[in-house]
Amino acid sequence: MEQISFHQENFRRRTRYTAVFLILAVVFCVVTVLNINTGNVHIPVPKILRILFLKEGAATEYNIIWKIRLPRILMAALLGGALSLSGFLLQTFFSNPIAGPFVLGISSGAKMVVALTMIVYLKYIGRFSSYTLILAAFIGSLISTGFILLMSKKVQHMASLLVGGIMIGYICSAITDFVVTFADDSDIVNLHGWSQGSFSGMSWSNIRVAAVVVGLAVLLTFFLSKPISAYQLGEAYAQSMGVNIKTFRVILILLSSILSACVTAFAGPISFVGIAVPFLARKAFGTSKPIVVIPGTFFMGAVFCMICDLIARMALAPVELNISTVTSILGAPIVIYMMIPKGGRK
């Protein structure tokens, strides 16, 4: 009888996982079509399908889809998934659902070093590559993360650590503003546009670079599913299962920093996605199993950022909102809900 009950429960879980992934896949397809369909130039769905699959159509519409809208959509999906997974790794590391690259100042650290790099390169060299920005953002992420790790050894309460992370973010932002004060006007325009956060202006070369970096990080994260699962049950249990805690924690931070750095390098700082989406994924799938939550978080983050980008483009068209404006409006209430005690818990 117990065996039958176990099989029934297992079947229900698998059905739920499959249903959620199917819903996400459908929403992904619908939002993709809407993103291509809407804009200053409206393109009917039949034309979209012909251009995408048969590569037939007017030159103007063809270029709008293949050179502007499709790269933007794919980049929003790729970076949205990366940022969500970065948040999941930080939440695993700190064992706290409020931990995220934006809240802990990691995105601000990446922004600071990228800003310095952009100003120096534009002033003395004239141009920079995508790899240069990713490396700069990664270094900035590690700087902020290093300070947070030092604080974590001295601070006992997670709330104090989170406040410390926010302060680090403010310090990095202040340094960025100070540097911008002495930059040329043309450099300030480039930096200001990037620092507001946006998926616009993406190219296929950007996608190729981001896909390699994010793809490798996601693959490594997925291979860590079993150690993460053990770590979620406590360090003592993880050690008993053969997990080298120090090495494992370093890998978590490095992967999270790489993912966050890639997002910041291409799209600028984006808020609340890294906190809200992992929470939504765990709620939707009804489990904390990494083997389910890791791909679920990435996929849900992709869909979430695609929806946010669509809202940013169309809410006040032809004026485009900053992507962080939309992610904050949608993500902040979710974070507030997370912090409200449930079931009388204080």
Could you describe each region identified by the protein language model?
Residues 1-346:
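Alpha-helical transmembrane segments in inner-membrane proteins
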